[in-house]
Amino acid sequence: MSFTYNRTVRFQDTDAAGVVYFANVLGICHEAYEESLEASSINLKDFFTNPSVAFPIVHASVDFLRPMFVGDKLLISLIPQKIGVEKFEITYEVTVAEVVVAKAITRHVCIDASSRSKQELPDEIVQWLETNRRDAEGAERRRSREIM
């Protein structure tokens, strides 16, 4: 099963039209990413303040399928996937009452924080990717059996 994160849309997330401001969807997705790391026993303080390695987002996109309003109960599902020795990508699906309202992608590259050059993903991230991949594949197999 993919990792899931529950979040309620707050007033501060919205714009003058009363819907979630477009850039805030990526912030909400990043919250889900952080929760998934923490759920895998990755220390967030160490992860984000490690002086030797960083994971900048080099690509991000969001498709908005329906508006999200204050008070909406969001369920964010994420599936991270390794796409090279130094890169990974996370796909997000945001739903409200089982209706998909947005889909997003973030691509991350592992770099040496001093030289800013690419480097291989550390073992803890490879393990996080592998665990989430297995969980997502297992959920997909269960779903396909239910359809048959």
Curated annotation (Swiss-Prot):
Gene3D superfamilies: Hotdog Thioesterase
Coiled-coil ranges per UniProt: none
Enzyme Commission number: 3.1.2.28
CDD domains the record matches: 4HBT
Alphabetical list of InterPro entries matching this protein: 4-hydroxybenzoyl-CoA_TE, DHNA_CoA_hydrolase, HotDog_dom_sf
Similarity annotation: Belongs to the 4-hydroxybenzoyl-CoA thioesterase family. DHNA-CoA hydrolase subfamily.
Role summary: Catalyzes the hydrolysis of 1,4-dihydroxy-2-naphthoyl-CoA (DHNA-CoA) to 1,4-dihydroxy-2-naphthoate (DHNA), a reaction involved in phylloquinone (vitamin K1) biosynthesis.
Example of a GO biological process term: phylloquinone biosynthetic process
HAMAP family reported for this sequence: DHNA_CoA_hydrolase (MF_02101)
Protein name per its UniProtKB record: 1,4-dihydroxy-2-naphthoyl-CoA hydrolase
One matching Pfam family: 4HBT_2
Catalytic activity: 1,4-dihydroxy-2-naphthoyl-CoA + H2O = 1,4-dihydroxy-2-naphthoate + CoA + H(+)
UniProt GO molecular function: 1,4-dihydroxy-2-naphthoyl-CoA thioesterase activity; fatty acyl-CoA hydrolase activity
Pathway membership: Cofactor biosynthesis; phylloquinone biosynthesis; Quinol/quinone metabolism; 1,4-dihydroxy-2-naphthoate biosynthesis; 1,4-dihydroxy-2-naphthoate from chorismate: step 7/7
Active site: D15
Keywords: Hydrolase
